[in-house]
């Protein structure tokens, strides 16, 4: 059989399209055969069953007694109970309200008319997620017209030279910079180091760090994170 034709036949057999999601997956070139596929059916059924349990709110992290529900944040309607659903909606509404007030100037820094820049401090997913969104949605400014929103900078490691470069780029605009510190636990060492270095940068310019900083953390650690910011 012609090689191209055999590839096409295999593609037709193994191309997977999920109705309603717009997601398609081509596994035809992965090199497995039918016997392997058949042998995996039991394992796949177990995996799908475990996923269904997670969707239903099963505890997946016994150390912290936590469920896994990152995707509930995108669609609170699928959260396993009303309490979680209401908490998610409440927090999302609060975030939207805060963001709107920052962008329209109702929340402003102590020494400037409004915030023009955002400095996000986080490690791992606390920085990677926002970086992905910022780079994907930033867009390209039109000629002689700047983009709306805050120009965003990231401190996502403990490299002192990297931090110094960012502080240099911000320069005098540090007084117009909103600092966002993200740590689920409220005590991530790398994130804390970045926050302390940034606080020192503010101090060197006689700026009130606490007046321009906000923390995103787990509810259990809110007071500790606030004490660190205000300290």
Kindly label every feature range from the protein language model:
Residues 1-110:
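Extended, charge-enriched "interface" segments that sit outside catalytic cores
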Residues 100, 113-224:
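Glycine-rich phosphate-binding loops that contact phosphosugars or nucleotide phosphates
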Residues 225-231:
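A short, hydrophobic C-terminal helix/tail in secreted or cell-surface proteins
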């Amino acid at each position: 059989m012609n090689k191209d034709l055999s590839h096409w036949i295999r593609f037709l057999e193994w191309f997977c399209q999920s109705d309603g999601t717009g997601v398609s997956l081509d596994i035809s070139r992965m090199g497995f055969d039918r016997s392997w596929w058949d042998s995996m059916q039991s394992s796949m059924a177990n995996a799908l069953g475990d996923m269904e349990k997670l969707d239903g709110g099963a505890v997946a992290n016994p150390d912290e007694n936590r469920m896994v529900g990152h995707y509930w944040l995108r669609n609170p309607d699928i959260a396993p109970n009303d309490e979680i659903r209401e908490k998610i909606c409440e927090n999302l509404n609060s975030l939207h309200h805060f963001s709107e007030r920052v962008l329209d100037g109702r929340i402003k820094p102590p020494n400037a008319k409004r915030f023009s820049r955002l400095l996000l401090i986080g490690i791992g997913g606390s920085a990677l997620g926002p970086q992905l969104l910022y780079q994907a949605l930033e867009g390209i400014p039109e000629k002689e017209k700047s983009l709306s929103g805050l120009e965003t900078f990231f401190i996502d490691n403990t490299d002192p030279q990297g931090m110094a470069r960012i502080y240099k780029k911000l320069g005098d605009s540090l007084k117009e910079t909103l600092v966002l510190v993200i740590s689920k636990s409220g005590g991530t060492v790398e994130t804390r180091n970045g926050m302390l270095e940034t606080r020192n940068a503010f101090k060197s310019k006689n700026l009130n760090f606490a007046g321009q900083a906000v923390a995103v953390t787990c509810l259990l650690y809110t007071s500790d994170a606030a004490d660190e910011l205000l300290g």
